From Swiss-Prot:
Residues 20-83 form the KRAB-related domain. PANTHER family: PROTEIN SSX7-RELATED (PTHR14112:SF30), SYNOVIAL SARCOMA, X MEMBER (PTHR14112). InterPro entries: aKRAB, KRAB, KRAB_dom_sf, SSXRD_motif. Disulfide bonds: none annotated. This is Putative protein SSX9. The keyword Transcription regulation applies. Could act as a modulator of transcription.
Length: 188
């Protein structure tokens, strides 16, 4: 129950990192430049270790898993972690986005709540995906509004004070309720 125990278990800045964790860090370090790796906190490094482990586990089980974005850019560094000096790889380093903890949120798909279908619209909705999941390709031209934008524009003014009323259904037959008395009250 003592809060000081948590600090005792946490590795200190000057302490040695266990060999197992260091080996996992070395496996991940080859995907980043030396500068990027030095800037990263250990918590970010651990996240990348787990991402790689999960990817490898899924592929070993036979599932088609997408390659984590940081693993796609193997050409930026050599095995010793030294940056290449030729123009092609330098351009790749500049073009690829720097993976930081804040950008990890964009990797995972955003879960969008399902919107109720409009009357007369029998088409099924397709969930939207984040930009990184689509490999940077836009699904529709930038000038044209997407289907979800069209739905939002069309249904925007209709949704007023009682947005939930369209979910109610009208009863076809009237239901007559009878008052049922408790058996204990009948005995009296």
């Amino acid at each position: 129950m003592n809060g000081d125990d948590a600090f005792a278990r946490r590795p200190r800045a000057g302490s040695q990192i266990p060999e197992k964790i260091q080996k996992a860090f070395d496996d991940i370090a080859k995907y980043f430049s030396k500068k990027e790796w030095e800037k990263m906190k250990s918590s970010e490094k651990i996240i990348y270790v787990y991402m790689k482990r999960k990817y490898e586990a899924m592929t070993k089980l036979g599932f088609k898993a997408t390659l984590p974005p940081f693993m796609c850019n193997t050409g930026a560094t050599d095995l010793q972690g030294n940056d290449f000096d030729n123009d092609r790889n330098h351009r790749n380093q500049v073009e690829r986005s720097q993976m930081t903890f804040g950008r990890l949120q964009g990797i995972f798909p955003k879960i969008m709540p399902k919107k109720p279908a409009e009357v007369g619209n029998d088409s099924k909705e397709v969930p939207e995906a984040s930009g990184l999941q689509n490999d940077g390709k836009q699904l529709c031209p930038p000038g044209k509004p997407t289907t979800s934008e069209k739905i939002n524009k069309a249904s925007g003014p209709k949704r007023g004070k009682h947005a939930w009323t369209h979910r109610l259904r009208e009863r076809k037959q009237l239901v007559i309720y009878e008052e049922i008395s408790d058996p204990e009250e009948d005995d009296e």
